[in-house]
């Protein structure tokens, strides 16, 4: 096989597809091609010459596989890719078919065919991988390979369009093309969105000018991931009333926002361990920066247990389960002055809005996440230290991530976790790029060429050696429902004497911690006690489950009228509490302010207390929305 015949023509016609990195976030409409000036034409010729020289050098340097052996490998790869697609299609068909028996029979046949294809591929794949092992495990050719990938994905024309803008832009590209380590970081992280490497380099440079901290460790990786992802601007989703707000996210400000949050200890502890590739899917959201800050503050105040849970599958994103009502009937009440995500937790939504909110709250705390649509339903996937997990959807195999089979995305993420070995996969992909192959995301895509097949079989070997564990989907049964059918175990919470101490000041003011209940004395499905970011503990009264009263028993030294106010956090308007003081026959209505996730106090109401023992009994009229309570203040009425 003559591997160089079609190289140059392919390169000059179009950029190689850049797979899972492109079209991740909402992008503006692509601008028309920029005409090249005379200087731009010379630059294009210069970059094309660089690319051609690298293609020739790499084609010569790549190890050769004997023709018959290569043909056998390709035949096995093509058969497995076709069988994988057929198996997936048969699985999906069973869900749609009216003739379930026939569909099940076809599904079983497809699985048998896939098993045969897998078995038939083992020998040719192992033989080829063994021969190519010295190349795959060596970084000797990396500098040339990564430079070629940058030139190929950006295209000489695209680079020239950027460089012709001025000496500064041309110098930035020269600096990038001379920095093998930086180019390698970029292409290992799946390259610049839209192949816009010049724009990515500009953003990265601007970030480093704006912050001296964006040069080391996680902050350098986050700066680079942000630069790559925002090379094609991300459309910003503003409050409807904010007609003067920027239309796209400012990537430098986005970086600085996360830098500040990280240094303040506001992000997830796992953030510091993210790769450049992971970081792309943290800072790529459509929300304004102030909305990210709101997301963190809201959850700290309103539902801190979602931050504190050890279960990474549900950390942060459990807010969808507990507080984003399923149904679109209230969306007419969205407020133009509120941000999109503030409206979602207030008025709810069907699968799309719930998945949007889930991804938003994960990004707010620095957790990588992506959309994962499946037929007729919107779900999400997100990072955990143990691997990526699906929320609110069916198991792996039923959806797509960035337009590719979710199982292909899963395999790629599992291989990426083996950081030392994963470059072996990439070297094979880079070799394929050098020889004009289209990148294949996985076996769920059509076979594209010899080297991409090598990459996929190497990836599989890495996954098997690592004994990677696939995390099961969670929240499948609440994807289109309000309450789970799974029985929830409510964990017992220890409330210390200090946390439930009722304090009477010298001025007669009494402060009752929300967790100082005489009934209930432990968390229930409706009433949860949890640690508070204000110190001590707080209560959350859930929107789900049956109504449940709660009481406080305390002593008062002087009888009389007292002004009662409650410190609350709400994410929906029109919240109310009803309080019975001692033996009162009728409750007093307490209106809770719409705090949009902040702490605030209710307008005071008067209650009559007796000297000695008193009981305040609170209840709510269902249906209700969630309500966080920190404490109650009773002030003597003069």
What are the functions of these language-model segments?
Residues 11-21:
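Bacterial N-terminal signal peptides
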Residues 485-638:
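Extracytoplasmic
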